Amino acid sequence: MRNLSIYAGPKARALIARQGLTPDMVEVVAGAAGGPKWLVLDGLDRAIFTSWLMQRSGPVFLLGSSVGTWRFAALAQGMDAHDRFRDAYLGQRFTSVPTAAQASAEIMKFLDAALEGGGPVRILSHPHARLTFLAVRCPGPYAVERKYPLFMLMAAAGLLNAAHRSLLSLLFSRVLFYDPRDLPPYHAMGGFPIRRVPLTPENVRPAVMASGSMPVIMSGVRDIPGAGPGMYRDAGILDYHLAVPFAGSKIVLFPHYTDRITPGWFDKLLPWRKPSVEDMANVVLLCPSKAFVASMPGGRIPSREDFWEFKGRDDERTAFWNHVLRASASLGEEFLEAVDRGTIGEHLEPIEPLCR
């Protein structure tokens, strides 16, 4: 494979060595935070969700964080909703640096595009997809919306995290939103205080928004129905790349934009922070190869920094994003070829070097 790299945990490798990889072997699909980086996964999303995964006979759990939640809220309805979300996302325009409220209003436009015409009901009635996702509940001081006080509070959280990741439990708690038709295998995940909230047609929209409401950049979401009073913010604070105990005995398919798995947002500058092999044992990580990334304009994929790099040149930014999006089709093609031919086992690399 030239464009796609595949890493697999020890249990996943053993399963694939015996059986290959079929849709019914996949129990969970994971979607990480990361802003516009998700655009490089469009080809994989199309391959997995349009033709391959929907051949399965039972439910599949979609676990999202931040923009991964937004992707899955669209994909859990079908490709029409995904295309509306993608097109609205590509259409973002900012004439100046937006306030948090302005950024939230703009982002709500493309979430509304994905959820229009009864999206929450479609999500909760999909025959196979079971949408689940994370958010973070913030205590009193972290509910403030004034930019500079919140920035200083988040900086203090970063210092606590640098000392030990577990110290973030003093400040934040996880919230797991889930489709109540089936409990996900990670329903009992530990590591941080957790609140589990069943999804309803009434809370899908604010909960999905909260999962990607990045502090300082966007406003938080208050008092989500069913979740209790409080301020809810971006899941990536605790679960940036979903280095979580997935549990279960089947495959966790993880289309990802990089071969690095960063546990929390504050860990981005701490390269020694990695997931455990135990938590990644069932994971099959699909990501663009280094050769693919090098072949993109500037030798990189889209990122949030593009809003600053292309400030005042939205058409150039959109052209770059569209180039990567179109090129990503090759990732999906290589994945489908490997699973259809039964050769995916030949392309697996151990995930252990990516772990601690």
For each predicted feature, which ranges?
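Catalytic nucleophile serine of serine hydrolases
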Residues: 66
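Patatin-like phospholipase
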Residues: 1-61, 74-356
